Structure formats: structure tokens, C-alpha cells
């Protein structure tokens, strides 16, 4: 209602922003919220007015909840960078920049650690793996591709990774395979996985997973 500005000032000192100002259609509520928002903006704080029909406000509140839930999930995520990050300048990002943007931690893992796991061989017989094997693809090629999958799964467990990116083309010469099948399986399992050492694509996929709970896939 009107006249809550001084009350808001006393409360806001005890709470961190951003601030969401829920209004009604009477008692000068919107005008009071606009005055508070102007104060916040003048002091470098973030705020938003929620105004409209109950269904419109309910939709806004749901979106706010989803965004804050996603931010909380991202802040606890460990994102694996296997091998050197790709040389493309548009794909480069520093650990500090990622941490500042979403709170996630970049974890560097040497390529040789992945290679050692691939040579070790083996993979879990998941539902996705079983479905691939039933397609009747060349057995030798499937074994090579799934060895990469098993290796990446073990790295995820060892380093507590929630997402990863890997230099797939570095697998071609020593193993005559790529990471495409492995990354597809990981994405389907809820582990965002990007190729070419592309950090920004990995972070984008992690953000989309945190927001929607749905898997993505990195196109060329």
C-alpha cells in the first residue's frame, strides 16, 4: 500500500537484493513500489515490480523461482575442462570469469588422464548404452566409442564433475574414434558435455540444464 517507503528502508538493510516489489491494484500500491524502485536504482541496487493480474504475477513468480533455483544449482557445479581450452577466442573463458558469472568452478584435467582411462577400457551398461548396442552398429567401432564414454564417466566420478568439455579431435590419432557418442550419452544422463574444449558452450549447456532439467547437444 502507500506509505511503506520508510518501512522498506529499515527492512532492506537486513536483506540482500535483488528486491521484488509485489503490488496490488489499490491503496496507491503501484506508486509506492515505483518510488522504492527509483530509490534502489539510484543506489545501484536491483529491483523489479510485480504488477498485474494474479495469473500474470504467478507466472512471474514461477520464473523468478526457476531462475534462483538454477543459480543455486550452478553455484555448486564443478565443470571439467579436459585438455587445453580451444584456441578460438570466442570460446575462451577464465575460471575467475566463470566463477563471477555463475559461481561454478572450472576443473582442469590433463588429456593424458583421459587417455589413460580410455586405454583401461570398460564402460557401464546403462540403458542408453544398451540401446546403442542393439542398433547393430559395427562392434569394433562401438567398443572404441564406448571406451571413451566409460573413461569420461570415471573422470566425472573421480573429480565430482557436473559438466565437462573435451578436445574430441585429440582422440582421432591415438584411438581412431571421437567423443560424439560419449557426449551424447552423458548429455542424455543429465551431465552437460561439450566438445572441442569449448568452455562457453559447456557453461551455456549447464545453464540450460539448470533452468529446464532437459539435456542439450552442441551443434557445429
Residue ranges and their predicted role:
Residues 1-220:
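An N-terminal assembly and electron-transfer interface module characteristic of large anaerobic redox
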Amino acid at each position: 500500500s502507500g506509505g511503506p517507503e520508510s518501512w522498506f528502508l529499515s527492512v532492506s538493510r537486513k536483506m540482500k537484493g535483488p528486491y521484488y516489489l509485489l503490488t496490488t491494484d489499490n491503496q496507491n500500491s503501484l506508486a509506492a513500489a515505483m518510488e522504492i524502485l527509483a530509490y534502489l536504482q539510484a543506489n545501484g541496487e536491483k529491483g523489479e515490480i510485480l504488477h498485474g493480474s494474479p495469473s500474470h504475477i504467478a507466472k512471474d513468480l514461477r520464473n523468478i523461482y526457476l531462475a534462483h533455483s538454477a543459480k543455486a544449482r550452478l553455484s555448486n557445479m564443478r565443470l571439467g575442462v579436459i585438455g587445453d581450452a580451444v584456441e578460438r577466442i570466442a570460446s575462451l573463458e577464465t575460471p575467475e570469469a566463470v566463477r563471477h558469472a555463475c559461481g561454478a568452478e572450472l576443473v582442469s584435467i590433463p588429456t593424458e588422464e583421459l587417455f589413460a582411462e580410455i586405454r583401461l577400457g570398460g564402460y557401464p551398461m546403462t540403458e542408453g548404452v544398451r540401446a546403442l548396442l542393439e542398433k547393430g552398429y559395427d562392434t569394433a567401432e562401438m567398443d572404441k566409442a564406448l571406451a571413451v564414454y566409460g573413461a569420461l564417466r570415471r573422470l566425472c566420478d573421480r573429480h565430482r564433475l557436473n559438466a565437462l568439455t573435451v578436445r574430441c579431435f585429440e582422440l582421432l590419432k591415438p584411438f581412431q574414434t571421437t567423443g560424439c557418442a560419449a557426449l551424447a550419452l552423458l548429455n542424455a544422463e543429465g551431465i552437460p558435455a561439450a566438445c572441442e574444449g569449448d568452455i562457453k558452450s559447456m557453461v551455456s549447456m549447464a545453464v540450460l540444464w539448470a533452468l529446464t532439467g532437459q539435456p542439450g547437444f552442441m551443434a557445429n
